[in-house]
Design a protein with these regions (language model features):
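An acidic/histidine-cluster motif and surrounding catalytic segment
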Residues: 1-117, 121-263
Length: 263
């Protein structure tokens, strides 16, 4: 069955306060060959208030051995034929495997929740003022919380549920990691670009949530997204169509370029 995850013993522990979130385990994805991105990103992460962060070596798509090892861990799933870019741009595979690497850490160690950031993050200038308010108003039952994202729907709310792209700033719970792991690896057509797989899971959940026979009825995949568009700022405006990625309170820095694909 597609979009399926087996029943498991959940860990229903969530950050209760914004301070809890800032003190939560935080992993920052960074390639070994990009130390300058880490140096810059680390300063931003410290300034944002995160105190329990740790750099994680990203799976380098330019290293075939790392790719092979990563796919072996996942059982060498087939690639979806329709996503030509997933094969054409191995950086997409590296991104996929890097996030699975962190989800595996969460699952193996039964970590209740973890902040996952990519090294090109930029925080909204009013992050310290806005983020605590957003967090206080976020329901504490999520599998995934998007601190930043690319909205694929018109939101009229500060905190919403809807399909989004991007993986640069997320909070993933143990329950979320378990669900994402299985939902993404059980696709009959194969795996493809990671945020495309996640957004398809979101759309499926929204379409089937009222179906009495749906898995999502009894054990839903639950996520929330922070909509920062109520607080415009010039720093979110970037070339190469990157501005659309910056709809939350955490943005992606276009000046670093992309290790995922050419732009």
């Amino acid at each position: 069955m597609e979009y399926y995850y087996k029943p498991f013993e959940e860990i229903n522990v969530f950050p209760k306060t914004f301070k809890d979130l800032l003190e939560a385990p935080c992993r920052v994805i960074n390639l070994d060959r990009n130390p300058e991105r880490w140096e810059i990103g680390e300063k931003k992460i410290i300034n944002a208030g995160f105190t329990n962060y740790k750099r994680v070596s990203a799976v380098d798509a330019k290293n075939n051995k790392q790719l092979d090892e990563g796919w072996n861990i996942l059982g060498n799933p087939k690639f979806a034929d329709w996503d030509k870019e997933f094969k054409e741009y191995p950086g997409k595979q590296g991104c996929f495997l890097s996030h699975f690497k962190i989800w595996k850490e969460i699952i193996d160690n039964k970590i209740p929740y973890m902040v996952i950031l990519e090294d090109d993050v930029i925080f909204h200038p009013k992050w310290k003022e806005l983020a605590p308010e957003y967090f206080d108003n976020t329901p504490k039952n999520f599998d995934v919380l998007y601190l930043g994202a690319q909205f694929e729907f018109n939101s009229k709310f500060h905190i919403d549920i809807g399909p989004v792209f991007c993986t640069h700033a997320m909070v993933v719970t143990y329950n979320g990691a378990k669900k994402l792991w299985e939902m993404l690896l059980n696709r009959k057509l194969g795996v493809y670009t990671i945020d495309c797989m996640i957004i398809d899971s979101m759309k499926h959940r929204l379409m089937t949530m009222n179906n009495e026979n749906s898995l999502f009825k009894s054990n839903p995949f639950t996520w929330y997204v922070w909509n920062g568009n109520f607080y415009p700022t010039e720093i979110k405006n970037m070339p190469k169509d990157w501005t659309k990625r910056n709809s939350g309170l955490v943005f992606q820095d276009e000046s670093f370029g992309s290790e995922v694909r050419e732009w």
